[in-house]
């Protein structure tokens, strides 16, 4: 086996992106022979300081060159003769100049009078020519501004690696008619829950037409829900979870559309109601009305996930309370010992507005106190309990057309004595809170475990 001795000579390699048909022109694109020699010598001593630029238009002074990147190599340089395939002059390649950066945007100055004038005067370094150089200050339109290009247009030197790939969750399926279509194979199952509002004439009586047959697991949850809806036709999701086996938690939202519909407005908002049952036509449904509260809690508030309100303990995950689930000794009697309406109201349901808003103000006062880690103020509670129950027409006519200044004056009028500033402040806060409208879209984090009640 023949062996060759590697020479002690070391070389630098330049990977030029063009064809070297003309040797002189080839060297000019790299700045000339002297620039090449200087860059190669510097690469062996200090590679970071080696500068070699590629200029595809050497005669254009405004061309933006591409700088080479120097990399250390341990390659071999050989000379091969085609006649006899012999190998000679084996040497080492220690440094390589690579032009891998993207070329900058180029701007041609060939038709620029200002650049031509600049080159013929300042660049020749002639005193008389420089002395004659002047800039025309005549105003021109912006689109006709003639000026030299900037030294750099783009600061992006390397191309972006986008890695464009087809969505792995999307696939092509064949339809019954023979055509093909692209579908999301791993998409979230849609929950075909029927929703309704207080403006409809009749409530839904059966499930959605697009709802298919339930799976075995979903059917088990349905069978567990049937006796609950027979006993009580209107439920919140949290109340149902507390009456079901914990293993059914994930499947509840898929089982509810088979038995119930969802209210999106009115006094039964965000409650699931048994198909065919209309709480607007049954005064006994007053016990199933729901009260909503916007509570902004921090991470320190933790509690049992219950649907019952006792007025003493804060349960952060529950923001919706049904009347039948309120056991607070102060509030519960107000809901039981009251005269109901003859017809269901779109906002306050079967309760008269005066009693309804009094209960809501009491619950809000207690909830805000519990958030602060305190017990509700007896002064505030008694003030609400002793306040006159104003019907809705009188309640809003006094305040809707008044600003904050008029509100303060009204509070002072209600408290004729005006001797206790603390009581006045409490009344102002209570009235402001009572006038806050709690929209369905404003409820924040009604339930952390079940944000998507409708599905995608």
Curated annotation (Swiss-Prot):
Q: Where in the cell is it found?
A: Nucleus
Q: How does it assemble?
A: Component of the TFIIIC complex including sfc1, sfc3, sfc4, sfc6 and sfc7. The subunits are organized in two globular domains, tauA and tauB, connected by a proteolysis-sensitive and flexible linker. Interacts with sfc3, sfc4 and sfc6.
Q: How is it modified after translation?
A: Phosphorylated.
Chief site of localization: nucleus
Q: Which Gene3D superfamilies match?
A: TFIIIC, subcomplex tauA, subunit Sfc1, barrel domain
The gene designation is sfc1
Q: What is this protein called?
A: Transcription factor tau subunit sfc1
Pfam families xref list = Tau95, Tau95_N
- Tell me, in a sentence or two, what this protein's role is: TFIIIC mediates tRNA and 5S RNA gene activation by binding to intragenic promoter elements. Upstream of the transcription start site, TFIIIC assembles the initiation complex TFIIIB-TFIIIC-tDNA, which is sufficient for RNA polymerase III recruitment and function. Part of the tauA domain of TFIIIC that binds boxA DNA promoter sites of tRNA and similar genes. Participates in the interconnection of tauA with tauB via its contacts with sfc3 and sfc6. Serves as a scaffold critical for tauA-DNA spatial configuration and tauB-DNA stability.
- Molecular function (Gene Ontology), one example: RNA polymerase III general transcription initiation factor activity
Decide whether keyword DNA-binding is in the record: yes
Could you confirm whether the keyword Cell membrane appears in this record?
Answer: no
Record InterPro entries: TF_IIIC_su-5_HTH, TF_IIIC_Tfc1/Sfc1, Tfc1/Sfc1_N, TFIIIC_tauA_Sfc1
Q: Which organism is it from?
A: Schizosaccharomyces pombe (strain 972 / ATCC 24843)
* The organism's place on the tree of life at top rank: Eukaryota
List all Polar residues biased stretches.
407-416
Query: Acidic residues composition bias: which ranges?
Result: 441-456
Q: Name one GO cellular component term.
A: cytoplasm
Question: What are the boundaries of the region Disordered?
Answer: 394-416, 437-456
- Source species taxonomy: Eukaryota, Fungi, Dikarya, Ascomycota, Taphrinomycotina
What UniProt keywords are attached to this protein's entry?
Answer: DNA-binding, Nucleus, Phosphoprotein, Transcription, Transcription regulation
Offer one example of a GO biological process linked to this entry: transcription initiation at RNA polymerase III promoter
């Amino acid at each position: 086996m023949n062996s060759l001795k590697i020479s002690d000579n070391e070389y630098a390699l330049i990977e030029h992106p063009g064809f070297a048909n003309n040797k002189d022109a080839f060297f000019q694109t790299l700045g000339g022979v002297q620039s090449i020699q200087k860059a190669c010598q510097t690469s062996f001593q200090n590679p970071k300081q080696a500068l070699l630029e590629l200029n595809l238009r050497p005669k254009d002074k405004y061309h933006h060159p591409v700088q080479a990147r120097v990399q250390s190599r341990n390659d071999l340089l050989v000379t091969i003769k085609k006649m006899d395939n012999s190998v000679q002059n084996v040497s080492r390649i220690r440094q390589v100049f690579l032009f891998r950066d993207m070329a900058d945007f180029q701007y041609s100055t060939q038709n620029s009078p200002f650049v031509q004038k600049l080159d013929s005067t300042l660049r020749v370094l002639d005193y008389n020519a420089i002395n004659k150089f002047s800039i025309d200050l005549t105003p021109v339109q912006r689109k006709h501004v003639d000026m030299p290009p900037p030294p750099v247009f783009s600061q992006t030197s390397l191309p972006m690696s986008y890695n464009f790939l087809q969505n792995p969750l999307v696939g092509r399926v064949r339809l019954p008619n023979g055509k093909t279509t692209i579908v999301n194979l791993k998409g979230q199952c849609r929950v075909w829950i029927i929703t309704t509002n207080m403006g409809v004439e009749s409530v839904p009586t059966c499930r959605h037409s697009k709802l298919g047959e339930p799976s075995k697991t979903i059917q088990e949850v349905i069978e567990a829900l049937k006796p609950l809806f027979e006993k009580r036709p209107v439920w919140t999701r949290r109340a149902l979870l507390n009456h079901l086996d914990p293993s059914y938690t994930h499947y509840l939202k898929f089982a509810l559309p088979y038995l119930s519909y969802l209210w999106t407005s009115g006094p039964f908002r965000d409650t699931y109601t048994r198909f065919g049952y209309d709480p607007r036509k049954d005064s006994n449904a007053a016990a199933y009305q729901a009260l909503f509260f916007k509570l902004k809690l921090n991470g320190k508030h933790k509690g049992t996930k219950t649907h019952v309100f006792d007025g003493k303990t804060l349960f952060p995950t529950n923001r919706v309370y049904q009347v039948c689930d309120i056991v607070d000794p102060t509030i519960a009697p107000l809901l039981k010992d009251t005269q109901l309406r003859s017809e269901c109201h779109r906002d306050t349901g079967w309760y008269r507005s005066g009693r309804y808003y009094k209960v809501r103000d009491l619950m809000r006062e207690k909830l805000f106190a519990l958030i602060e880690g305190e017990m509700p103020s007896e002064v505030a509670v008694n003030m609400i309990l002793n306040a006159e129950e104003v019907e809705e027409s009188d309640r809003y006519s006094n305040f809707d057309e008044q600003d904050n200044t008029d509100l303060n004056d009204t509070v002072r009028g209600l408290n004729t004595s005006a001797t206790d500033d603390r009581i006045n402040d409490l009344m102002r806060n209570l009235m402001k809170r009572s006038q806050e409208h709690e929209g369905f879209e404003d409820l924040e984090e009604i339930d952390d475990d079940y944000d998507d009640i409708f599905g995608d």
